[in-house]
From Swiss-Prot:
It is found in: Cytoplasm. This is Probable transcriptional regulatory protein SpyM51586. It comes from Streptococcus pyogenes serotype M5 (strain Manfredo). NCBIfam families: PRK00110.1, PRK12378.1, YebC/PmpR family DNA-binding transcriptional regulator. GO terms for cellular component: cytosol. HAMAP family: Transcrip_reg_TACO1, Transcrip_reg_TACO1_YeeN. Keywords: Cytoplasm, DNA-binding, Transcription, Transcription regulation. Pfam families: TACO1_YebC_N, Transcrip_reg.
């Protein structure tokens, strides 16, 4: 499973890197985090978390600095979080999280992306109840039992720890993600491949052939929207 999360980050970075979409999306997220609190990551836990995630996605330092500098200025641009749930082919389910300065534009764009690519946007709550929100931490290692004990000793609410092919994946309660990261740092982990809040499907579906091709086009259309920050789904091995 750890390889899955690392592959998702690598795939997204490779796909978006050429057009700098991933940079722009992190730029907005960093700006919002800095604007809502102190523009200093040492004094703003949320900002530090976003910056760490940006670095994992290979976002350049100048992009991070520019977003923080923008937040320090007099701009009054505001962004609103949104969530759009829907369905793809053959039992696939999708959750789209957005961050936008124009809610009407974003809602229309997401609905169009669903409708023109074999999907169907549903009502709020139509899909999310079949997903669980968890903290996901991925780093190099192979001793899951030791990591589990370290997290318990640090009073971290940990759901599971998996080891696979030299990679450790930790699942925490969403409220304990930051606490888990700090506990691992305190125990010598210096570099993380993934530190994310994720929506984990309670069960997965397998798509093949035309269904898989349609689903891939649908996900690409959703992720290509500038206002879309995260896309979650229940399709296995994708």
């Amino acid at each position: 499973m750890g390889r899955k999360w690392a592959n998702i980050v690598a795939k997204k970075t490779a796909k978006d890197g050429a057009t700098s979409k991933v940079y722009a999306k992190f730029g907005v997220e960093i700006y919002v985090a800095a604007k809502q609190g102190e523009p200093d990551p040492e004094l703003n836990t949320t900002l530090k978390f976003v910056i760490d995630r940006a670095k994992q996605a290979q976002v350049p330092k100048h992009v991070i600095d520019k977003a923080i500098d923008k937040a320090k200025g007099n701009t009054d641009e505001t962004f609103v979080e949104g969530r759009y749930e829907g369905f793809g082919p053959n039992g696939s389910m999708i959750i789209v999280d957005t961050l936008t300065s124009n809610v009407n534009r974003t809602a229309a764009n997401v609905r169009t992306a669903y409708g023109k690519n074999g999907g169907n946007m549903g009502a709020s709550g139509s899909v999310s109840y079949l997903f669980d929100k968890k903290g996901v931490i991925v780093f190099a290692g192979d001793d899951a039992d030791s990591v589990f004990e370290q997290l318990l000793e640090a009073d971290v609410d940990v759901d599971d720890v998996e080891a696979e092919e030299g990679t450790i994946t930790v699942y925490t309660a969403p409220t304990d993600l930051h606490k888990g990261i700090q506990a691992l740092r305190d125990n010598g982990v210096e570099e993380f491949q993934v530190t994310e809040l994720e929506m984990i499907p309670q069960s997965e579906v397998v798509l093949e052939g035309d269904d898989l091709e349609t689903f891939e086009k649908l996900i690409d259309a959703l992720e290509s929207d500038d206002d879309v920050q995260k896309v979650y789904h229940n399709v296995a091995d994708f």
